[in-house]
A protein has these predicted regions:
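N-terminal Sec-pathway targeting helices
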Residues: 1-11
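Acidic (Asp/Glu)-rich catalytic clusters
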Residues: 296-298, 332-338, 421, 442-444
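Alpha-helix termini
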Residues: 157-159, 334-335, 415-420
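His/Asp/Glu-enriched, well-ordered alpha-helical/loop segment
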Residues: 260, 386-396, 400-426, 430-431, ...
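Conserved alpha/beta core surface patches that mediate binding of polyanionic ligands
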Residues: 330, 338, 342-345
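Divalent metal-binding segments
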Residues: 29-51, 55, 59-326, 345, ...
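Bacterial N-terminal signal peptides
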Residues: 10-23
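Ligand-binding beta-strand-loop-alpha-helix segment within the catalytic cores
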Residues: 448
Length: 512
């Protein structure tokens, strides 16, 4: 697989999330919350920006070479002559700053996680790829020796002997086996917590386990969670994380760390041209809103933040069906409105485990004999899907493996048979592995696809060698198959699963 690269030289104009254009008239744009390219809002001054090409994303007028902007509104787009004609006798100034550039509307990351993005990227990042952040770049660690060396350097750099060392980005296939013993060799006294690259696993050394007050006995008898941990190795994954996260977050997700991480994430998204994002599966309490609003809701933050309620946590918390629906409606009702808000009548459900951990459910298993996991059992997923389907919700269903996709499509088929809904737009989220028959079923059932194309760039080559084999790894994220069947398709980063860099994601699916 070739390395991805930029195909065009692009400048993102402003932070307008959509274009509403005509060829010889005026049109309004959605509210612009970044004034970088807008001249003196509310003064009546019109600026006409010229460009080599403007990709409008409007089917009736896909290309332009000039766009007229006044304050928060896009007035017209087309050729320079067409724009002048549309403006009539209104005064305007022509700005040729982008004359040799290609312009895009503001970019939307359809699926990312601000809480995870803030936490992961505020740790010592030692990952499988470079992470270019505002003011700092974390280079990739390419093998086990390099990984452990970087971890030891991070330990040595900490001043306080009792300070925690938090790191994110570890992956078995790049960095070799990691366990409690290996972390104890880095430090037997400093608490160390390593967050696996997928964010679905944690490794703790003995000092961290003692600092958090965990005991082996307390880890037993907790249902599925107790089957997804290894005490001796200091390893917790998927549902097993429920056993450790509350105490761990008290020392990890401190207000100081979260404020730093969120502000860094705002700068990171802005430098990559993101103008809006959604987090499907948000766990937001009143305290989280208090943290988010001053930062994400600030007038100075140049993008919108939208959220969809998480249904998996309702199962984990033991809520019944009626209680779950009421809890969802309450969470949306209590949320603020404006730049930071919940989207009503939408819900996030989960099928199988993370692809980055190779814990998705595969019909033909894995080449090394390990097995995948369910984030929600098929039975729970079916019940919750039926609950929210019957209540008129749009379903967003996380699924990565082809076996997981079979389960999701079977559930969707039952919903359509029992309670048909037109234009339900159920979202197949991530869409890592599939076959052509499954893509055809997606089309027949009226679902849509939100895919993560970074899987093919970041992981396919390694998975061809380990776990999946080349036949399945080389066919991950079948975007072309989706488009051939006229299924609506969007891309997302799932930050921090992939970098939130939409221009790179434009390139990723076309390279094999």
């Amino acid at each position: 697989m070739k390395h991805y690269r930029f195909l065009v030289s692009v400048v993102v104009i402003g932070l307008v999330t959509a274009w509403m254009l005509i060829s010889a008239g005026s049109a309004l744009a959605q509210r612009d919350i970044n004034r970088q390219f807008v001249s003196a809002p509310s003064t009546g001054i019109v600026t006409v920006y010229t460009a080599k090409k403007i990709l409008t994303m409007e089917l009736s007028n896909p290309d332009a070479t000039a766009v007229a902007v006044e304050g928060k509104h896009i007035l017209a787009a087309g050729s320079l002559d067409e724009v002048k004609a549309a403006l009539g006798d209104r005064k305007f100034a022509v700005n040729d700053t982008f004359q040799s550039k290609v312009l895009l509307p503001g970019l939307i990351d359809q699926h990312l996680h601000p809480f995870l993005g803030a936490l992961t990227l505020s740790t010592e990042v030692i990952s499988t790829e470079d992470w270019v952040l505002p003011g700092r770049t974390f280079k990739a660690a390419n093998d086990a020796n390099e990984y452990i060396s970087r971890l030891k350097s991070a330990d040595a750099a900490l001043k306080g002997k009792n300070d925690w060392l938090f790191s994110w980005g570890y992956h078995l296939l790049w960095h070799g086996k990691l366990d409690r013993k290996a972390l104890d060799a880095v430090s037997s006294t400093r608490p160390i917590a390593v967050w696996q690259r997928s964010c679905h696993e944690f490794y703790l050394n003995t000092a961290a386990i003692k600092a958090l007050g965990f005991t082996e006995e307390a880890m037993k008898g907790k249902g599925d969670a107790s089957t997804m941990m290894n005490w001796e190795e200091g390893h917790w994954w998927e549902t097993g994380l429920n056993l450790i996260m509350e105490p761990l977050l008290k020392v990890f997700a401190t207000p100081e760390r979260m404020v730093f991480g969120l502000k860094q994430m705002v700068a990171y998204l802005h430098q990559n041209g993101v103008t809006a994002y959604m987090e499907p599966g948000a766990l937001i309490t009143p305290d989280i809103w208090k943290l988010y609003q001053p930062i994400l809701g600030s007038d100075e933050t140049p993008f919108y933040s939208y959220f969809v309620v998480d249904a998996r946590s309702q199962v984990d918390d033991g809520l019944g069906l009626a209680e779950s629906l009421a809890a969802t409606e309450k969470q949306v009702a209590l949320a603020p409105q404006g730049k930071v808000s919940f989207i009503p009548k939408q819900i996030k459900l989960f099928a199988d485990g993370a692809i980055i951990s190779q814990l998705m459910q595969m019909k033909d298993g894995y080449t090394d004999g390990h097995h995948g996991e369910w984030m929600m059992t098929p039975e729970n997923l079916d019940q919750r899907a039926q609950l929210y389907w019957n209540a008129g919700y749009q379903l967003h269903i996380h699924v990565n493996g082809d076996l997981g996709l079979d389960v999701v499509l079977d559930i969707l088929e039952r919903r359509m048979r029992e309670t048909p809904r037109a234009n339900h737009r159920t979202v197949i989220v991530h869409f890592a592995t599939s076959n052509e028959e499954q893509v055809a079923r997606i089309a027949r059932l009226g679902a849509i696809v939100s895919a993560n194309p970074y899987y093919t760039v970041g992981f396919a080559d390694k998975y061809a060698q380990f776990g999946l084999g080349p036949k399945r790894a080389d066919a991950m994220v079948r975007s072309a198959s989706v488009l051939k069947r006229h299924i609506p398709l969007s891309f997302h980063s799932d930050l921090p699963m992939g970098p939130s860099s939409p221009l790179n994601f434009v390139c990723a699916p076309s390279i094999a």
